[in-house]
Amino acid sequence: MTNLFEHINLHPSDDRGHLLTEQVNPKSECLDQLSTESLVTLFCEEDREPQRAVAAAIPELIQAVEAITDRLRSGGRLFYLGAGTSGRLGVLDAAECPPTFCSDPDLVQGVLAGGSSALLKSSEGLEDIEQAGQKDLQQRGFSSADCLVGIAAGGTTPYVKGGLAYAKEINALAIAISCVPIEQAELPCSIDIRLLTGPELLTGSTRLKAGTATKMALNILSTCAMVRLGKVFGNRMVDVAATNIKLMDRALRILHDLADVDRDRGSELLQASDGSVKVALLMHACGLDAEAAQKLLIEQNNQLRTALASCGNCIS
């Protein structure tokens, strides 16, 4: 039988009770005695805290979005690194980028302690191996051109600290996300995002408010960076990969809404453009064939708005 604790030093660990995420929430001290109605109401009320915590971190989020965008525009990649819930949230956000923005699967990557198997089966003990964070990044070819977002709700995860330290060491962009004040747990990074959601209703269960705030922050980082990279026109995902019926319908509606293209003509354009909404729009608006539209888009750094303007069209 495998010893799950063979890699752990079983001497008494540091007391983490001072960490904000480990403290007891006075609102829920009688949690097990509440009625179902009171339980649900309490959770709904407490889940207002993540939004407030994320709003308080707007300056750091702006800084992070701009820095990530600069790196991606220069050929770098974005990596999320975490263990447990934090790592799973990073994997989730990374996995959504290709279908939403037609980005290369390598552009945004989620790195989870324990690998893909840890998505379904908890491997939280692996977070205690500091060298593993660096090793996992190295195995993916992480370089000085890339960005790392290290996610550690309590700010003490050795796996994440090791990865962030390595990113700083090689002059990559190192961004930290945690849910405790900096004086409680410092992290090696250039941009430090603190989402202070407070003690959890279920003491120490950071999959709750801390996880919600983290998901919100990751949504902001990836989506805003993709907007800055020109993968959005207005509020439409014009780089959507039309890979199923739902997404094909969305692509057709985008063509109709932006250029008044009916569905039959839209289907023809999407077939000719190999499913690219941007190319289809340029074909229709500028009277180009697919090859010329693709060439124009490349010349304009994949920015649809400037490509349209260059052929005298001002779709808004």
UniProtKB/Swiss-Prot annotation:
Name recorded for this polypeptide: N-acetylmuramic acid 6-phosphate etherase
Family (UniProt): Belongs to the GCKR-like family. MurNAc-6-P etherase subfamily.
Record: active site: 96 (proton donor), 127
Reactions the enzyme catalyzes: N-acetyl-D-muramate 6-phosphate + H2O = N-acetyl-D-glucosamine 6-phosphate + (R)-lactate
Biological classification of the source: Bacteria, Bacillati, Cyanobacteriota, Cyanophyceae, Synechococcales
Enzyme Commission designation: 4.2.1.126
Something else known: A lyase-type mechanism (elimination/hydration) is suggested for the cleavage of the lactyl ether bond of MurNAc 6-phosphate, with the formation of an alpha,beta-unsaturated aldehyde intermediate with (E)-stereochemistry, followed by the syn addition of water to give product.
Transmembrane segments: none
Domain SIS: 68-231
